[in-house]
């Protein structure tokens, strides 16, 4: 596994992070997002993203910027598939399109900020390392039902490979957990995410997602049948 074979979007983003801004790379990343989302429906509800861009997301060595690049890739993917989306950065500095990892990981405060806007769902996108007030996210998550807050909150783990050990990277184990390490997992992650939304927006997304997937499978079958 390398930094650049976990999907085209994150591969371009890794190069941007490691080599500095390039108009050509930025355009290639944008095109990769468009191609990856072309056949997906749009979720019409309100989505809040708590995006971890704290210092720990930089990592080091061969994995430098890898988890962060995959998190940003997922964010750009979501931005194309969500009609109403708001991002709450945890740490980070510089360009909002390509934030540099910096600062502490205070996921709890960002979650509270996100919930104030009453979204249909909150996705916490993080590498799982909580280095500010450890345990606060778990306490906040556990207290939400007592505060009559029933907004679905899902923890989305950004990984380097499918074999990453997450045992020490679950700051709120009671939250529903989704994992991703490759761009190919994004569509199913969206399906899992929005299936937790109550109401018509979630139902509509699931229905359109499955219909588009069925149509794609039928087209693939027709091509295969014609060539055999």
How would you name each of these model-derived features?
Residues 2-228:
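Acidic, glycine-rich A-domain
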């Amino acid at each position: 596994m390398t930094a650049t074979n976990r999907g085209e979007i994150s591969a371009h983003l890794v190069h941007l992070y490691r080599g500095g801004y390039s108009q050509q790379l930025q355009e290639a990343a944008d095109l990769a997002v468009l191609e990856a989302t072309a056949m997906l429906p749009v979720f019409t509800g309100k989505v809040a993203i708590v995006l971890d861009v704290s210092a720990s997301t930089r990592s080091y060595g061969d994995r430098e910027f890898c988890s962060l690049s995959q998190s940003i890739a997922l964010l750009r993917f979501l931005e194309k598939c969500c009609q109403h989306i708001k991002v709450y950065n945890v740490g980070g500095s510089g360009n909002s399109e390509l934030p540099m990892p910096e600062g502490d990981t205070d996921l709890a405060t960002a979650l509270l900020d996100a919930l104030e806007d009453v979204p249909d769902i909150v996705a916490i996108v993080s590498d799982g390392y909580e280095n500010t007030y450890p345990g606060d996210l778990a306490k906040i998550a556990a207290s939400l039902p007592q505060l009559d807050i029933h907004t679905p909150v899902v923890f989305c783990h950004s990984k380097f490979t499918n074999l990453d050990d997450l045992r020490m990277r679950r700051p709120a184990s009671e939250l529903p957990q989704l994992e991703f390490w490759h761009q190919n997992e994004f569509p199913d992650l969206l399906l899992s995410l929005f299936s937790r939304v109550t109401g018509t927006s979630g139902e509509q997304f699931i229905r359109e997602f499955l219909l588009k997937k069925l149509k794609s499978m039928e087209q693939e079958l027709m091509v295969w049948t014609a060539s055999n």
